[in-house]
């Protein structure tokens, strides 16, 4: 009997947001959603609506964050960590980014809708 090795399948989501940033294609994006300077060593994807509370892993619900700030928030409500000024500074960084796999203006508009919905609750 011949036994074939099974190759594991990765279900890791590859967000164009983080991927393009890591490639250096977003030089205007220097700060995470909660502030802090982004580096290749500390960048992480933040779920605006926590994954543990039903938040989807999609661009409409993801932001770049400094890992330490992301971990501090955990699954606590976004309004405990994000001020209006912080959010406006974050999305402003994306408004002139137009890449084949990423439209910064569209991203900023969709993320704004997500944050506004969560703040109404």
Q: What are the functions of these language-model segments?
A:
Residues 1-13, 17-19:
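Non-Sec secretion/translocation targeting segments of pathogen effectors
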Residues 2-5, 25, 111:
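Generic short amphipathic/hydrophobic targeting helices enriched at N-termini
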Residues 14-23, 45-52:
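Short Cys/His-rich Zn2+-coordinating modules
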Residues 20-43, 66:
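Short cysteine-rich loop/turn motifs with clustered Cys
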Residues 35-64, 73, 78:
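Histidine-centered nuclease catalytic patch
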Residues 60-61, 68-121:
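A detector for short metal-coordination/catalytic motifs
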């Amino acid at each position: 009997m011949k036994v074939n090795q099974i190759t594991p399948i990765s279900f890791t989501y590859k967000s164009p947001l983080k991927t393009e940033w890591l490639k250096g294609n977003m030089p205007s994006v220097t700060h995470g959603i909660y502030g802090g300077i982004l580096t290749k060593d500390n960048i992480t994807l933040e779920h605006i609506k926590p994954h543990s509370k039903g938040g989807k892993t999609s661009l409409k619900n993801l932001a770049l964050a400094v890992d330490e700030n992301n971990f501090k928030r955990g699954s606590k409500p976004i309004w405990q960590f994000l001020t209006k000024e912080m959010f406006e500074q974050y999305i402003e960084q994306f408004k002139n980014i137009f890449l084949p796999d990423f439209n910064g203006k569209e991203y900023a508009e969709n993320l704004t809708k997500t944050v506004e919905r969560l703040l109404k609750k």
